[in-house]
Swiss-Prot record:
<feature type="binding site">
    <location>
        <position position="85"/>
    </location>
    <ligand>
        <name>Na(+)</name>
    </ligand>
</feature>
<feature type="transmembrane region" description="Helical">
    <location>
        <begin position="75"/>
        <end position="95"/>
    </location>
</feature>
<keyword id="KW-0812">Transmembrane</keyword>
<keyword id="KW-0472">Membrane</keyword>
<keyword id="KW-0915">Sodium</keyword>
<keyword id="KW-0479">Metal-binding</keyword>
<dbReference type="GO" id="GO:0140114">
    <property type="term" value="P:cellular detoxification of fluoride"/>
</dbReference>
<comment type="similarity">
    <text>Belongs to the fluoride channel Fluc/FEX (TC 1.A.43) family.</text>
</comment>
<feature type="transmembrane region" description="Helical">
    <location>
        <begin position="107"/>
        <end position="127"/>
    </location>
</feature>
<dbReference type="GO" id="GO:0046872">
    <property type="term" value="F:metal ion binding"/>
</dbReference>
<keyword id="KW-0407">Ion channel</keyword>
<dbReference type="GO" id="GO:0005886">
    <property type="term" value="C:plasma membrane"/>
</dbReference>
<feature type="binding site">
    <location>
        <position position="82"/>
    </location>
    <ligand>
        <name>Na(+)</name>
    </ligand>
</feature>
<keyword id="KW-0997">Cell inner membrane</keyword>
<feature type="transmembrane region" description="Helical">
    <location>
        <begin position="11"/>
        <end position="31"/>
    </location>
</feature>
<feature type="transmembrane region" description="Helical">
    <location>
        <begin position="42"/>
        <end position="62"/>
    </location>
</feature>
<keyword id="KW-1003">Cell membrane</keyword>
C-alpha cells in the first residue's frame, strides 16, 4: 500500500506541512517576544527566508530532477515551504498597518517583502546551483 504514489505523495506533503507550520509558528512567537508586535518582523523574516529556500530548492532539486525523489520534492516544496511561507498573512499584516494609519511601516513592509522576496529567490537559485556544482551533479 505504501508503495503507491497516491499514498506516499499526500503523506510526504503532510509531514512537510507539519514541520513548516510549526517552524512558522515558533519563529513568529520568537520574533514577537524579541521585537514586539508593532511590526510583523516574524512574517517578514519567514517570507524572505521562505523565498530564499524555495529558490535554493528549485535550483538544486527541480532543475536536477533525478537528484531528489518526488516524495522529497513534495515534502519540501509543497509541504514544508507551502506551510512555512504565508503571503496571505503578509496581505493581512499590510492591511492592519494601513488600518492603524502606519503608512510608512505599511509601505516598507509591502515593498520590502516583495522586493527582498524576489532578490532572495535569485540568491537561493544561485546558491543552489553552486551547491549542485560542488556535489558534482
Amino acid at each position: 500500500m505504501l508503495q503507491q504514489p497516491t499514498i506516499r505523495h499526500p503523506i510526504a506533503v503532510s509531514l512537510g506541512a507539519i514541520a513548516g507550520a510549526l517552524s512558522r509558528y515558533y519563529l513568529s512567537l520568537w520574533f514577537a517576544q524579541r521585537f514586539g508586535i508593532t511590526f510583523p518582523y516574524g512574517t517578514l523574516f519567514i517570507n524572505i527566508t521562505g523565498c530564499l529556500a524555495m529558490g535554493f530548492f528549485y535550483a538544486l532539486a527541480l532543475e536536477r530532477v533525478s537528484l531528489i525523489s518526488p516524495e522529497i520534492r513534495l515534502l519540501i516544496a509543497v509541504g514544508f515551504l507551502g506551510a512555512y511561507t504565508t503571503f496571505s498573512t503578509y496581505a493581512l499584516d499590510t492591511f492592519t498597518l494601513l488600518g492603524d494609519r502606519n503608512l510608512v511601516a505599511a509601505g516598507f513592509y509591502w515593498a520590502g517583502s516583495t522586493i527582498l522576496g524576489v532578490i532572495s529567490i535569485q540568491i537561493g537559485i544561485i546558491l543552489g546551483r553552486l551547491c549542485g556544482k560542488g556535489l558534482g551533479v
